[in-house]
Amino acid sequence: MSKHELSLVEVTHYTDPEVLAIVKDFHVRGNFASLPEFAERTFVSAVPLAHLEKFENKEVLFRPGFSSVINISSSHNFSRERLPSGINFCDKNKLSIRTIEKLLVNAFSSPDPGSVRRPYPSGGALYPIEVFLCRLSENTENWQAGTNVYHYLPLSQALEPVATCNTQSLYRSLSGGDSERLGKPHFALVYCIIFEKALFKYRYRGYRMALMETGSMYQNAVLVADQIGLKNRVWAGYTDSYVAKTMNLDQRTVAPLIVQFFGDVNDDKCLQ
């Protein structure tokens, strides 16, 4: 047992079973089913498609008409604009496992080998969100044969083998069967919550903090991906139970929260 390893049995000992049951019940209300090969595309929005643009990229004023706003000079802005999310991914070019490792260690691990602080905040330093690496393309160099799903250990900076499912089945589950829109990404990260780890200290509040932590994590991955030349897209259009089963995850303990695809976006080459 490594010095960083935590037994879930210990965490479960301090978890209120009633809180756990209520949070799980609430969580599954957000589960989704997306299998386009069996049905039309599923839309959860009540807004007609023709009207959606009216609601996108807008601001809400809390006191409209009652007070004038104070403008801030755009000269203060020194950050770069976020690159657009990738679509129509293409795996024509080989991707080295070294590039993937570079993403993982810079997005989720400290540059100081002796530090336990990660690049994103976590309530109570509990870090209840786990990152799983899923290979989706055979066009990856130096990937160890036999395993296509790994669990990333950010303190050890190591990969734990989890599942041996083939890349086609894995991509079908993560994409919700909607691979035509996405194209051919090289790999994906799946962010999963360990319920007991999120709840044992802060109870219901811990669930909220875990969801916010997930956003910090994938935004960090966005920033690193931009720097190393990877395109990415955050994706929620998948069937939760199907993803968990394909990845060999015990849904009584852990659940996928969001998927993030990575790779090249390479014009028309993959459409030929």
Swiss-Prot record:
GO terms for cellular component: cytoplasm. It comes from Escherichia coli. Pfam families: Nitroreductase. InterPro entries: Bacteriocin_Proc_Enz, Nitroreductase, Nitroreductase-like, SagB-type_dehydrogenase. To R.leguminosarum TfxB which is involved in the processing of trifolitoxin. This is Microcin B17-processing protein McbC. Necessary to process the inactive microcin B17 (McbA) precursor into the active peptide. PANTHER family: NITROREDUCTASE MJ1384-RELATED.
